[in-house]
Swiss-Prot record:
It is found in: Cytoplasm. Belongs to the UvrC family. GO terms for molecular function: DNA binding; excinuclease ABC activity. The keyword DNA damage applies. The UvrABC repair system catalyzes the recognition and processing of DNA lesions. UvrC both incises the 5' and 3' sides of the lesion. The N-terminal half is responsible for the 3' incision and the C-terminal half is responsible for the 5' incision. SUPFAM superfamilies: C-terminal UvrC-binding domain of UvrB (SSF46600), GIY-YIG endonuclease (SSF82771), RuvA domain 2-like (SSF47781). GO terms for biological process: nucleotide-excision repair; SOS response. The gene is uvrC. Residues 203-238 form the UVR domain. Keywords: Cytoplasm, DNA damage, DNA excision, DNA repair, Excision nuclease, SOS response. This is UvrABC system protein C. The keyword Ion transport does not apply. InterPro entries: GIY-YIG_endonuc, GIY-YIG_endonuc_sf, GIY-YIG_UvrC_Cho, RuvA_2-like, UVR_dom, UVR_dom_sf, UvrABC_protein_C, UvrC. Interacts with UvrB in an incision complex.
Length: 612
């Protein structure tokens, strides 16, 4: 129980805006908050009548408090969310998803490039989005390339072409990289139509194309007219599939928050240029006894204010929960976005009301599904605890090895907590310096890389699964015996998961720890299902890493054997000629044009690739 002297502390706290950080006895930040008046806000935690069980638990763990005075409440709001992002305090609502949204980017070049983009908007050009996920933006990009044949290639590839690439041959690019294949006006028209299409002005695009088709037909240029006709049909087909909200609607995000049985879901509907671009559900980590207003405050702040996210902030944010600081938050978002941002939490009417109802339906459905999945995971955890006679299992890790005939070996480590896969903690390890195919040595190297270093208490697993039989488990046990670390290396229970006859799921044998006790579980065992889940995750993670490594080796292997072609020259060849296929199909003159490649070396490269 905390022995914090609140009275002595509060005596020196000023009546000013700022941020406060609460620490436990281990010097870990357990809560971050902001206040218009620090003294009043902090005093509220130490009243005789505690506001909630959450506050009671928080106050009971306070060892000391730090404060930072700010110029304004708005500045405090931004600083609060930066601290939450940095320290992930135990008693704050935490937004787990840490990825920025993808956009479509139309660059500012003589011949603009259309490409998918994620990250800081430092590249000059027009950004369209955000799209809810990478799949959505790739689908849109693929569709647009079929309708409007403008380039999508990297600048280095574009600048070094002497003949059109495959994209031109299949009708997906006008080949502006090579003189004589399309005029500047023709290319500019395609760019204009792409821009209008992405702005939601489909009808204008069709009108332009109709005019062009009629002019071509009147001039008896039926081939060109047919091309415009095909474009019109493609745009109309897209119109039929797209979910059009209302052309008069502003850019807006519509957010519904649902909360049940300790789980929360924030469902966001993205509307841009009158079109619903998509939706996305978030499941923030919520401390016990958190009320909906605090949940809404923290989620909205973290979602839009975490500076490394590069969020697209719309003109309006519509929310089905009240906010305690909606005016201050709107002011801060306006400053961040460079345009006026309004936050609406009541009196939503018309189309906006209907879309809010849609977001609410989706939030409830997503939360219901998450609760069912969570219940299943918890039941499986309980079954595993009973099987292994463990009082608690907070963290499990599983390792697997993947290679092709001993080459490009990769080890994977996946992590599960009580809520299932913790993908942000997944890791892969490149295994080097071992005899090809020696899985024992590969596993040893992976375990040393993972555990032979300082680990915080919360990162020490309760169970480590090794995908393999007694031999793999023995090697893992030897690794742990040799570890010289400050953390308790005897805490994790090591378990080998040996594949059954014919490697069929359900016939696995568990080999438990140092006693090597063998357990065969029935095929319908919830504990077995959990073990299969984490084992399969590790297997897939290892295979995907191995495939990437193998592909990279395949791309580079054709050049590695050529004398005089080191890493830098190899990289230049691949970069300027568009990958290994581009290098192999390049002419001698094209190879000579690559920076750093002499005429003599170009001849050697050309002869080697064409004679091999």
């Amino acid at each position: 129980m905390s022995q914090f002297n609140a009275k002595a502390f509060l005596a020196d706290v000023p009546h000013l805006p700022g941020v406060y950080r609460m620490y436990d006895a281990n010097q870990a930040i357990i809560y971050v908050g902001k206040a218009k008046d620090l003294k009043k806000r902090l005093a509220s935690y130490f009243r005789s009548q505690v506001a909630s069980k959450k506050i009671e638990a928080l106050v009971g763990n306070i060892h000391h408090i730090d404060t930072t005075i700010t110029h304004s409440e708005t500045e405090a709001l931004l600083l609060e969310h930066n601290y939450i992002k940095q320290h992930q305090p135990k008693y704050n609502v935490l937004l787990r998803d840490d990825k920025s949204y993808p956009y479509l980017l139309l660059t500012k070049h003589q011949h603009p490039r259309l490409t998918a983009f994620r990250g800081s908007k430092k590249v000059a050009g027009e950004y369209f989005g955000p799209y809810p996920n990478v799949s959505a933006v790739r689908e849109s990009l693929n569709l647009l390339q079929k309708i409007f044949p403008i380039r999508q290639c990297e600048d280095n590839y574009y600048k070094n072409r002497s003949r059109p690439c495959l994209q031109h041959q299949i009708g997906r690019c006008l080949a502006p990289c090579v003189t004589g294949y399309c005029s500047q006006q023709e290319y500019d028209n395609q760019v204009k139509w792409v821009r209008l299409f992405l702005q939601g002005k489909d009808s204008q695009v069709i009108d332009y194309l109709m005019q062009k088709m009629e002019i071509a037909a009147s001039e008896l240029d039926f081939e060109t007219a047919a091309r415009f006709r095909d474009q019109i049909q493609s745009v109309r087909a897209v119109q039929e599939k797209q979910f059009v909200a209302n052309q008069r609607l502003d850019d807006l995000d519509i957010i519904s928050i649902a909360y049940q049985s300790g789980l929360a879901c924030a469902h966001i509907l993205f509307i841009r240029q009158g079109k619903v671009l998509g939706n996305r559900a978030y499941f923030p980590k919520v401390p016990s006894h958190t009320d909906l207003t605090e949940l809404a405050d923290t989620f909205i702040g973290q979602f839009y204010l975490q500076l490394n996210q590069h969020r697209s902030i719309p003109n309006q944010i519509i929310l089905d929960q009240p906010l305690t600081e909606s005016n201050a938050l709107a002011q801060l978002l306006t400053e961040q976005a460079g345009h006026k941002v309004t936050i609406i939490t009541n009196h939503v009417r018309g189309d906006k009301s209907r879309y809010l109802a849609l977001a609410q339906t989706n939030a409830r459905a997503a939360l219901s599904l998450q609760l069912k999945q969570s219940t299943t995971i918890h039941k499986r955890y309980d079954a595993l605890k009973i099987l292994l006679k463990l009082p608690t299992i907070k963290r499990m890790e599983c390792f697997d090895i993947s290679h092709t005939m001993g080459s490009q070996t990769v080890a994977s480590c996946v992590v599960f907590d009580e809520n299932g896969p913790l993908k942000s903690d997944y890791r892969r390890f490149n295994i080097e310096g071992i005899t090809g195919g020696d899985d024992y040595a590969g596993m040893e190297q992976a375990l040393v890389k993972r555990y032979d270093k300082p680990l915080p208490i919360e990162k020490i697993p309760d169970i480590i699964f090794i995908d393999g039989g007694k031999g793999q488990l023995n090697r893992a046990l030897q690794v742990f015996e040799k570890l010289t670390v400050a953390w308790d290396k005897h805490k994790p229970l090591l378990i080998g998961v040996a594949k059954g006859a014919e490697r069929k799921a359900g016939l696995e044998t568990l080999i438990i720890g140092r006693l090597k006790k063998e357990i065969h579980l029935p095929i319908d065992s919830p504990a077995l299902h959990l073990i299969q889940h984490i084992r399969d995750e590790s297997h897939h993670h290892a295979i995907s890493g191995h495939r990437k490594k193998r592909q990279k080796a395949f791309v580079e292997s054709g050049l590695e054997s050529i004398a005089g072609v080191g890493a830098k020259r190899r990289q230049a060849l691949l970069k300027y000629l568009g990958g290994m296929q581009g290098v192999k199909s390049a002419t001698l003159a094209e190879i000579e044009s690559v920076p750093g490649i002499s005429k003599t070396l170009a001849g050697v490269i050309f002869d080697t690739l064409h004679n091999s």
